[in-house]
Amino acid sequence: MMCFPYVLSCPAEEAYVAKDTDFSSTLTRIKSENPEFVFIPGYYEEVGLIIKQAREMGITVPFMGADGWDSPKLIELAGAENLNNTYITNHYSSEDPDENIQKFVQAFNDKYSKSPDAFNALGYDSVYLLKDAIERAGSTDSEKVKDALAETKDLSLITGVVSIDENHNPIKSATVLEYKDGKQVFNSKVNP
């Protein structure tokens, strides 16, 4: 469980080990610090138990995390009511009202009779990222395509706007989802 001292004050930073099941001592320390929110960049297996135990201890502040929370099992582990007032960032949401996203969702649903998830959207985007690089390279030569990929700047895709930085890391949009009564609900999109 982390905080970002350059954004907000950070009253405490705690850690846990994967596969832990009892978080009471850690949560007791966190509760004593009276935080504004708790950030857990973990996976649903532990996060579900942490949130359940936190709510049982009376910790009602928002919890925030990332795509490691994105599993139906999180709801089973935490309980739908305990997930209220929790938020995650993810790559995409089928509820995003953006017109291009809704066209993608409709086309995917028409073909596969289900809504696309984040992995479907990322797969779709990876094809268009490569297509864009090939077109800008004017070639399918691997070195030219690699160089074009590295120069990607402000490419608008289904999962958001993507640029590649000097270390070859993607700088991209993040979709904020909120849990309401056990369901992920689109909250907002943060662009770089």
Task: Give each language-model segment a name.
Residues 1-192:
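Extracytosolic ligand-binding ectodomains
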